[in-house]
Amino acid sequence: MSDLQGRKIFKVFNQDFIVDERYTVTKELGQGAYGIVCAAVNNQTSEGVAIKKVTNVFSKKILAKRALREIKLLQHFRGHRNITCLYDMDIPRPDNFNETYLYEELMECDLAAIIRSGQPLTDAHFQSFIYQILCGLKYIHSANVLHRDLKPGNLLVNADCELKICDFGLARGFSVDPEENAGYMTEYVATRWYRAPEIMLSFQSYTKAIDVWSVGCILAELLGGRPFFKGRDYVDQLNQILHILGTPNEETLSRIGSPRAQEYVRNLPFMAKKPFPTLFPNANPDALDLLDRMLAFDPSSRISVEQALEHPYLHIWHDASDEPDCPTTFNFDFEVVEDVGEMRKMILDEVYRFRQLVRTAPGAGGHGAPHAPQVPIPAGAGQGQWKAEDPRPQEYVGQMNDLEAELAGGLDQRR
């Protein structure tokens, strides 16, 4: 990795994109705050890959930690059929580098593009998507990891309806000990529309239920064709949730950790829960029953991933013998590292070790035989042009009013 030998330079979004000489860049796929992505083809095998250039890795400590977290978790989960597979990594200029290249599975589009394309999807599509999300999430949770940013844009889909979870940059560890758990829950800026109410309302700790809430929001979006809780800000987000789910009971209200937020909710007029069959009159009743259990306001009442996989709505796909747990839990000890120089060394070591692994054992890491549900996506889905709305909050909340700031920071704000 000492120089550009064995690599080629392409222009992607007007930036230099340095790739292994075996590959030719074929298409620009996207760009965002954390980097740019293109499609490429292996000139020897004709297989396609997605190459992600993570930029400005060390411009902020939070970005360096995010890159390290993503690299480690993609390796840990490598091979599960519903989690994006990491094929290779590269740091072309390791001396004082500020960018890292990740070679991953190439997928057709993300679920957000499919939903927003307006193409008709059937109940069979919904079952397939939710089942695959839950299979991937079961594997993630069994490693004591919370994804914390599940949303349609982080679910990659192929034309044959194969779905894979991506983007682990906001993931954190989970412990049954609330005090130990709380230590990992910092710098949380996950997407507002899919964010569980207990996070905004500062319940004592987070649990795996926060990811289940996000899956419920995704199911509702599939059923309705648009985001279910589309808050303009955090106060509006909370209001929209309460408007649909109704006023929480006293036991739940008493667990709201933020006094200001608790007072706000108590001072609202009583709201009755809106029946899901009224909101989604054409939906499968089993889908609405699962949705109701996923969107339980109180996380202690929310259905678990394991229970959801056994729900009647998913019986056509459910096979306990083909829904594996991760063999090992994930070690989050690196999270305590705060020195950027140390993180730079850790990322370099991770990339070097992984390159050695894939060059000596290319097939390492498989878990479970691929079996993508064969429900084709309608032609044209994901092909249309649409302007994505970004509900992600700012990294700071200093210009918000007091209640908005508390809801944005949630439990993290109190640490």
Swiss-Prot record:
Biological processes, Gene Ontology terms: cell integrity MAPK cascade; negative regulation of glucose mediated signaling pathway; negative regulation of mitotic cytokinesis; positive regulation of calcium ion import across plasma membrane; positive regulation of calcium-mediated signaling; positive regulation of developmental process; regulation of fungal-type cell wall biogenesis
Gene disruption phenotype: Leads to sensitivity to cell-wall-digesting enzymes, as well as reduced sporulation and fertility. Abolishes pathogenicity by blocking the penetration of appressoria into plant cell surfaces. Does not affect the ability to trigger early plant-cell defense responses. Affects the expression of MPG1 and GSK1.
Pfam families, alphabetized: Pkinase
InterPro entries assigned to the protein according to its UniProt record, in alphabetical order: Kinase-like_dom_sf, MAP_kinase, MAP_kinase_CS, Prot_kinase_dom, Protein_kinase_ATP_BS, Ser/Thr_kinase_AS
Domain Protein kinase intervals: 23-314
Sequence positions that bind ATP: L29, G30, Q31, G32, A33, Y34, G35, I36, V37, K52
Origin: domain of life: Eukaryota
GO CC terms in record: cytoplasm; nucleus
EC nos: 2.7.11.24
Cofactor(s) of this protein: Mg(2+)
Segments for region (Disordered): 363-394
Keyword entries, A-Z: ATP-binding, Kinase, Magnesium, Nucleotide-binding, Serine/threonine-protein kinase, Transferase, Virulence
Recorded GO MF terms: ATP binding; MAP kinase activity; protein serine kinase activity
Gene3D superfamilies named in the record: Phosphorylase Kinase, domain 1 (3.30.200.20), Transferase(Phosphotransferase) domain 1 (1.10.510.10)
Catalytic activity: L-seryl-[protein] + ATP = O-phospho-L-seryl-[protein] + ADP + H(+); L-threonyl-[protein] + ATP = O-phospho-L-threonyl-[protein] + ADP + H(+)
Subunit structure of this chain's protein: Interacts with transcription factor MIG1. Interacts with transcription factor SWI6.
Function statement: Mitogen-activated protein kinase; part of the MCK1-MKK2-MPS1 MAP kinase (MAPK) signal transduction cascade that is essential for cell wall integrity and plant infection, but not for plant defense responses. Beside its role in pathogenesis, the MPS1 cascade is active in conidiation and cellular stress responses. Targets downstream of the MPS1-MAPK pathway include transcription factors MIG1 and SWI6, as well as GSK1 and MPG1.
Family: Belongs to the protein kinase superfamily. Ser/Thr protein kinase family. MAP kinase subfamily.
Protein name: Mitogen-activated protein kinase MPS1
